[in-house]
Amino acid sequence: MESVTRHRADMISFFTFDSYISIVGVAYTAVGLLGVFCNVTTVIMILTNRVFRLSAYTIMANVALADSIVMLIAGVACGMDVMWPNPNDLTSFIPSLEEPYQKIAPVSLRNDSKTDSSAAGFETGNIHAVLSFSFVAAWTAGVISYAMLGTNRCIAICYYGTKARALNQVSVAVACSASTWIVGIAAALVGTLSQPMIGIQRTMWSISFLEPRPHTTLFFTLLCAANLLGLGAQWVCSTLVLLKIRQVKKKISKNKLNQNSANRFRKQVILALNEIIVTGNFKARLTFQFFYPSILCTISTFLFFIKPYAFEYLSGWQLVILHLLWLCNHTCNPFIYAYFNDRMRLTYKEILTCAAIRYQIRKRRSSHPFRMHGRHNVSKRSNAAGMKSTRISARSGRTNRDGNFVRNSLQMQSRDFEQLCEFIMRVNPLYDSSEGWRESSDDEPFQPEFTKELESAHNQGGSSRFDSEREAKSIVLDLGRQTVEHWVKFAKKASI
């Protein structure tokens, strides 16, 4: 390698070549480790918490698993190769920095096994073949999982009352997740059966196709078709959800949607998303959650497929920025989950702060409070009382967490219930226990139901007319009964 003081015009002047290599490698590795950590945490959280055993969370776990493998290879492995390249290819990075406008034949790590016939070279080639296979399988499975997640949310919001609702089950989600890996493994076999077609490209500072003309291969066609299918499904589902939100918002604003339909739509959205959505930010949050992830996935896929044809027109730092943007796309999902879902944010906090371990430590200390100091003059009765209080506090802590989850998740229904109570107080301030509730306007004076019953019996000689009128005007109690039934179903579904 030439002198370390070698500079380039489009770099910052105080960066030498070695320092530039170190910064890029550290950035790749740091973002990769962050992505692996966040996505693995998401997988563990969904698998170990019973409250997340729903179809949408199952697909989210599959997406997180695929993203963690992609980040491990494209982030950590690629960053380490940037910092510590093979000794036989030390100058392979220089052409991408020195001559960005000249077409340079790509140099892959697979060449190490071709030029070196020793056992070490053969082992290195096998390692890179395994990395290439894992990357293709995980990336393909992740893209298809995105499409299935969008379909799941679209059914939950737009087609919740139809027979398509049966598709949003945990068993169906597990089967769909397994099918994504079957498709990914099949694509990886095609791409690595004879020799790896995707690997670390040092001339591109990224992972890309090894063939100079990848569009001529069958593997490129299959991979492109799978990605186009996944992106198309994402965009169709996102568009349907946004149109549904816009339609319902317009009807509510024009007072063309009755109360039952509005409540039913709110319940569908809460059951579908299982998250806290403030009424004022309802449309904005759903728009962000369904629209912008599709944009990020589309940009990421476009960058991956266009890079083999555009890298000769880009300089080194531009290729580095593109690769970092690509890595950020596979890292941002846990942050989106934590922002939109209070329950997931609380669980993330418990995992990151080691709440379970700290609880066990406090429990052990409280069960043996004086062992460290050698004091044994505490009676068994007081010790048992302390252990009992610890168990009660632990149960109350879990109850508070579960209660917070139910209370937050049913925030909208609580508002409806408050309006129901206000309506009942307005039309029946005497707390009559009968079901003869009657909707009254603010203009007409209030008249109790028992007075109307007496007048009706006195004038018409019977209560048959009153009974039919009372039966026809029991809308309020029906609404309250439906609300309570919905709460019970939601609590059972959340296993609380």
UniProtKB/Swiss-Prot annotation:
Q: Which SUPFAM superfamilies match?
A: Family A G protein-coupled receptor-like
Q: Which residues are glycosylated?
A: N111
User: What's an example GO BP annotation here?
Assistant: G protein-coupled receptor signaling pathway
Gene Ontology cellular-component terms for this entry are: plasma membrane
- Record-annotated membrane-spanning stretches: 20-40, 59-79, 129-149, 170-190, 217-237, 286-306, 319-339
In this chain, the stretch annotated as Disordered covers: 451-470
Question: InterPro entries this protein is in?
Answer: GPCR_Rhodpsn (IPR000276)
**This protein's record includes keyword Cell membrane:** yes
Disulphides: none
Q: How does it sit in the membrane?
A: Multi-pass membrane protein
Keyword flag Lipid biosynthesis: no
Q: Name one GO molecular function term.
A: G protein-coupled receptor activity
Which residues point to the Cytoplasmic side? 41-58, 150-169, 238-285, 340-496
Instruction: Give residue spans on the Extracellular membrane side.
Output: 1-19, 80-128, 191-216, 307-318
Q: Where does it live in the cell?
A: Cell membrane
Keyword set for this entry? Cell membrane, G-protein coupled receptor, Glycoprotein, Membrane, Receptor, Transducer, Transmembrane, Transmembrane helix
Family of this protein: Belongs to the G-protein coupled receptor 1 family.
Name of the protein described by the UniProt record: Probable G-protein coupled receptor K01A12.3
State the organism's lineage: Eukaryota, Metazoa, Ecdysozoa, Nematoda, Chromadorea
